[in-house]
UniProtKB/Swiss-Prot annotation:
Family affiliation: Belongs to the plant self-incompatibility (S1) protein family.
Gene name in the database record: SPH30
Alphabetized InterPro entries for the sequence: Self-incomp_S1
One GO BP: rejection of self pollen
Native organism: Arabidopsis thaliana (Mouse-ear cress)
Gene Ontology CC: one annotated term: extracellular region
Protein keywords: Glycoprotein, Secreted, Self-incompatibility, Signal
Name of the protein in its database record: S-protein homolog 30
């Protein structure tokens, strides 16, 4: 007796999603950020002006909806008087995870900017809360 088993599946691994945080405020102006998800808390960190961007790399959690928030803070003389709690990534309801998604967020003096694709200009989407 000969038994043959055939398995079908995805041949390609799911590329991790990326949330990128940039400090484009001004020379000497520090961006403080606290990023957290429904399963991880990365703690409070600081990013100098034009420093290497901070990147969160992750896979979507199925069946849970992956969600990342970052509280961004900045101010003159590092007073951190301006802030915004930004939902930087949210997976929609789905059975198949998203792969290779980009969410780029940049802090500038006049607001918070966003891009969803590489090589596209950042657009202002939020204004700072005081």
């Amino acid at each position: 007796m000969l038994v043959t088993i055939t398995c079908f599946g995805l041949n390609q691994a799911c590329i991790k999603n990326h949330v990128v945080i940039l400090n484009l405020l001004a020379p000497g102006r520090i961006l403080e950020y606290h990023c957290y998800s429904n399963v991880d808390d990365l703690g409070v960190k600081r990013l100098d002006f034009n420093a290497t961007p901070f990147t969160i790399k992750f896979h979507d959690e199925i069946p849970n909806l992956t969600k990342w928030n970052c509280i961004l803070r900045q101010g003159p003389n590092n007073s951190m008087e301006y802030s915004y709690d930004v939902e930087v990534y949210k997976a929609g309801p789905r059975l198949i995870p998203r792969c290779g998604q980009l969410r780029a967020w940049a802090a500038r003096i006049d607001g918070i900017y966003f891009a969803r694709k590489y090589n596209t200009p950042l657009k202002r989407v939020l204004f700072w809360n005081k």
